[in-house]
Structure formats: C-alpha cells, structure tokens
Amino acid sequence: MFSIYSMYFIFLILFVDKINVNGLDPSDIVIVILDQKEGYHMAHAEMLKKNILEQAEALDKDPPKIILSHKLNINGSWTIIPLLNYLLDTYSTSKWFFFCLENTVIRLNKLLSILLKYKENKNIWIGHVLYDQEPTIIHHFAEHKKKLKYPHIASGFGITSNLLANLVHKINEGDRPKDDFSIDASYEFASFVLKVGKGVRLTHVSEICIISNSECATYPRFFHPCGSSVTTENIYFAVKTCSKFHIERIPVIKRTWAKYATNIGYFSDIADKHLPDSFIVPNTTQGHCAKTYSILVQADKILKKKNLNWLIISDDDTIFSVARLLRLLTCYNPNTPVAIGERYGFQLWDSDYGYEYLTGGAGVALSASLVHEIIELGKCECPSSTTPDDMFLFGICLSRIRVQPVHSSMFHQARPSDYATAYLASQEPISFHKFWMIEPQTVYDEWFAEADKSLITVRKHTEL
C-alpha cells in the first residue's frame, strides 16, 4: 500500500513539475499589433488590446505584453524587420512574439494552447500559410524550387524567442534586406527568414484561420462600414489616361464601375469628342508627376466649386467597386488631411531617407482638405515632369506636409491572379489593376458587379 501511494505521489510531483516547466502563461507572450496612427485604425488597435487584457483577466492570469506599433515611431515598422531589435532588447525574457493587425480577432486561451505545442527554444514560426500559384509581379516574379510559404498577417503569426534572437543576430551582422522596394511585407519577411534562418520555413497551423469557425484561435475580422453618409455625389473620380488608350480602355471603364460615378473626369493629352467630360493635361511616357500634379490642381477647383469631400485618382486600367469604396470612406473624416490606398515602401532600411507611399495603380483616395493643402502650401511641385508621380506626390510630398498615408489591404496594385486565393478570401477587395492578360469585364463581373448593384437601388430612391 505504501509503495503504491509513494509511486502515485512521485508521479504527481513530476506531473505538476512538468506543467510548471512547459506551461505557457499569457505574460510569456508579446503581442505586436501592426497598426496605424490614423484615428480609425488606432481605435481598432486599442479595442483589440482591451479585449486581450479582458481575456487574460478572465483567465486570472497576468496579461501579455501588448505593443501598438505606431507608438514606437520606428520607420517601416509595418515591414516587421525594423521592429526586431527593439523587441529583443525590451522583451528578452519572453517566449513568443505574436504579430497581427488591428482587425485580427484573438482567442487568447486557444492561442496559448497552440503555442504550447511548440518549443520556444527552437527556430520555429507558425501561421496560416499562403503561397503563390505562379510567379507574380508583386513578388518580383520570384521563382523558387520549393514554393515559398508566407503568413497571412491579418490572421497573425508567431515567432519563438529563439528564432527572433537568431534573426536579430543576423541583422546586426549586416545581413538585413537591402531591396529598394517593400511591396508585400509578409512575403518579404518570409524570404528573409528563409535566407538567414538556415532554411526555416513557416509552419501551417489550421487554427490560425482565414475565415472564422469555432476552432479558430485567430482570424481576420471582415470590414464593416462606420456609417452610411458617403454617396457618389460626395466624390470626384479623376481618371488618368492618354489618347493611346481612349478606344482600348475607356469604354471598359464606362461599362463597368464608371457608370456609378456621379462626378467623373478623364485627364488626357488631347481632346476627344467621345470624352466630353475630359481635361487636357501634359503627358509623359514615364513618371507622370507633372500630369498627376495638373490633375490635382484642376481637381482642387472642382472640389471647391461643387463642395465635394473626396478625390479618387485612378489609372485607366484600374477596376473598382464603387459601392465598397463608399463604405470604406465612411470611416474617415474628409475635413482632415487623409490619403488612403495601398502602401509601398522605398528604401525603408534607410532610416534617414526611406519613405512609404501609396501606389497609384491601385487607386488613391484623397480628402478634399488634403488636396487643398497639397496645392496651396506649395511644397509639392514636381522635381521634374517624369518623376514617379505616386512616389513623390503620395509619398515624399505627404511627408513634407506631415501626413502619413493610410494603408488599406482592400486596394490592389495587381490583378486577382497575382494574389494568393486564401488572401483574397479574407476580405472584400475594392480595386484591382492592370488589363494585362485578363478580360477586365470578367474581373469586374466576378469581383465587383454584385456589390455595385446596391448603388442602382440607392440611385432609384434618390431620383424618387
């Protein structure tokens, strides 16, 4: 009897000890919310932080360390790599680092259960795996013998303290990325980890989800509008074109999204009787800075005359859902300087000269007050007519007038086929770009036509 009791007691001690050694508390984790300074995004980041703290309290545990990246003022923090040194220096005793966005939903207890399955002293990172079906422009047409796995950031991904320390060691040895352009932070970070982490590949975890279900530890929350006050009557669409594409592209735009635009102008190099709502602006074969600046000057007058709130600048091969664009704009104040689109970076590894900008092909939404500032302050005249317009006007110029561009993942610089299927499944896209090797009418019909039908009903009610 004594021996049986003794064996049971020893087993119990060993079992409890094992739990204590291998257990993972919320306080062992650092959660990094890759957020933005703009009010709407910052508010959602604060709500996520509050929710995580409440979950930790419900578990009767000390909470995770939670970082809102915008508060660190680290240049290019959205590309992740610039944050790593700070994280290791500040939270050297933490076991896991979990990165997410402000629209990520986190079920803390389930996340802890997942992380507990892996050893933090190993080079491991976990997430929801995405991969390219074929080489794509947004990933520099890179080809890999084995498909590169990269995480869906909106679902979140975790990195062990050991892997993070090894990455920082490589960075400090000078082995940091020196690519000029940052386009897709997730893909580029995965490439970096694979290169300097001795072949460490992302581990797929099904509970880190794209679409919510009861088993999910995390998943991205779909966008919800903040009101219903923005209508097509509040917006002016400026389409950049040239005579070369009047016949090939403009009819496509008019058949698809432009038929829902109450106020629209086509900015071209020559007059065209088939484009009565057109304006003549200087054209160049590259860069287009003078052309886009001329559009801003003309649009500023139109916005003032018609008392409009928003300017949308579009290429002549950009495809929109006007209805989804209107819903997005309900979350921003047009009386403050706001620029919204898809964010790219240029030489972000250079803390003195690197900057971010909104890429023009995806479409750019500018508040009327921002357009007025760009023109009236006189700080944004193009260095040359062929300077890249988006990099200068929606990057350097915004920096000069102290306006940070707002990134929305629903704007897309490329075609649907250039993105991972699961990535697009987690959102409702607003735009795609390029009429190259696609049928643009089909793209519009498949992605946007159904959403835009709601505008037909709205217009009928308005006319009544």
What name fits each language-model region?
Residues F2-L464:
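Secretory-pathway lumenal glyco-enzymes, predominantly type II signal-anchor Golgi glycosyltransferases
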